[in-house]
């Protein structure tokens, strides 16, 4: 797995093994046919600190960015979907790539 490329990765998700919220967020992104870059901290523990640097200490898993904008976690991702905003965000980053 490569390090996050903040300039080109349209959708980024930081995850950890055994995290139900991480699985739910991945599932939603997959259902939306979003291409995303996943940073599993089990594969590279330094990604945990990188996530904290980007999202703030004490942030929970997962943490998600779309088009360089911090969305938050699984609850925020699903809220965007319920509000009808997620599809537009994903389409806009797809168009940029």
Stretches with model-predicted labels:
Residues 2-5, 62, 78:
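Short secondary-structure boundary/capping segments
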Residues 2-37:
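Local sequence-structure signature of Cys/Sec-based thiol-disulfide redox active-site neighborhoods
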Residues 20, 46, 72:
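Short alpha-helical
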Residues 22, 45, 80:
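Loop/helix-junction capping segments adjacent to catalytic residues or to phosphate/diphosphate-binding pockets
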Residues 27-29, 52, 78-80:
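Short, glycine/charged-enriched secondary-structure capping and boundary segments
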Residues 41-59, 85-92:
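Thioredoxin-like thiol-disulfide oxidoreductase module
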Residues 56-65, 75:
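Structural micro-motif
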Residues 66-96:
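Non-catalytic, surface beta->alpha helical segment in thiol-disulfide oxidoreductase systems
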